[in-house]
Amino acid sequence: MALETTPWNVQDHLQTPEECVLYLEAVFEEARDDPAFIAKAIGDVARARGMTQTARAAGISREGLYKALSEEGNPSFGTVLKVLTALGLRLQVELEAT
């Protein structure tokens, strides 16, 4: 008998701002050396919160935002900061545990 599975979409699990923050914190912790993965994760949050609204608030075209935050995208640091601000988030720096 074949095992039946259902598609899993991360955006379905990013319903609150707190869930979005926890998701991005985990991504930054686990994939700190993978900018493409981090950009895609920010894109996941933007899609969960509404890509059109996020793009408008960031001052970026919707298509440009999809492209920048895709797996093949390579957003500028400025774009990342604009998107985080549009999502009501901010980048925070802390000391690495030694």
Regions found by a protein language model. Name each.
Residues 47-67:
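Short alpha-helical DNA-recognition segment
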Residues 3, 92-98:
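Short, charged recognition helix plus adjacent turn
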Residues 22-25, 65-67, 75:
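Extended, folded domain segments that form the structural surfaces/walls around functional sites
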Residues 1-41:
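N-terminal flexible/basic segments that precede or flank functional cores
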Residues 76-94:
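DNA major-groove recognition helix of helix-turn-helix/homeodomain DNA-binding modules
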Residues 20, 34, 38, 42, ...:
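Amphipathic alpha-helical interface surfaces
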Residues 13, 28-29, 47, 70-73:
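Alpha-solenoid HEAT/Armadillo repeat architecture
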